[in-house]
Amino acid sequence: ILKTSLKNNVKTIHIQNPKLPFKYFDLLIIPEHDNVTAKNVIQTKGALSFFNYNELKKIEEKKIKLIKGNKKNLILLMIGGNNKRYKPNNSDYYYLSMKILEATKNLSCQLVVLLSRRTPSKAVKILNSSFLKHNENFQIITSSEQNLYPDILKIADYMIVTSDSVNMISETASLSTPLFVSYLSKETGKILNFLKNLEKLGYIKNFEGKLFNYKKTKLNTNKETVLKVNKFLRLQKIT
């Protein structure tokens, strides 16, 4: 209605695939891995992020001590879960826990596990049981308790995100902290292409039970998208 009334004095921009004819929009911002092209489509390398590193709050020193204890490193594990493509089984979560234990056994570290609303309760029990047996320096935080996110990212030394969490990967890839992606289940199609492309460009590393520092490229999806949108609007001669 607004577009009909104001005509060229307003421009319609839609983020993600609208599942409607593209002619109804002046501009669409769609992730590159969706493989959608049109003259009014801007592709982004990943999902748009709602924060950047400079906007993260400084966590109080006493709170850092509560989180890290006397450990040198903070490892942040972010887990997704059931999604439209697959439902990880119990062995997938057990295998993930074994890889985490392998990665942390020789590190002075505190492990913080952030869960998603998609993480099933059975998975939480498996992770908790595995970590209790082999690593006392951990805490699991449910989605309803996550008042530390995203600020905790500022004190993380290593980040591990499961492959199903595309938005979380895009957000954390924008930081300089080493980022590792763990495949909960076999990925295919556009998600696999997205992850392989990020790995090729140096934004992420595949998690195989080892954590290490590397020369990480920061994903600047937001900044690059703003530049593309501004260029598009200038070409459209917006006044």
Where in the sequence are the language-model features?
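Structural loop-to-beta junction motif characteristic of Rossmann-like glycosyltransferase folds
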Residues: 176-180
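Leloir-type glycosyltransferase catalytic cores
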Residues: 195-239
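Glycosyltransferases and closely related glycan-assembly transferases
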Residues: 1-13
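Short internal beta-strands
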Residues: 28-30, 110-117, 182-183
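Short, charged/polar "capping" segments at the starts of alpha-helices
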Residues: 22, 37, 85-86, 119-125, ...
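A nucleotide-sugar donor-handling region in carbohydrate enzymes
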Residues: 22-92, 207, 211-216, 223
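Conserved catalytic-core segment of nucleotide-activated headgroup transferases in glycan assembly
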Residues: 82-114
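Donor nucleotide-activated moiety binding/catalytic core segment of transferases
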Residues: 128-167
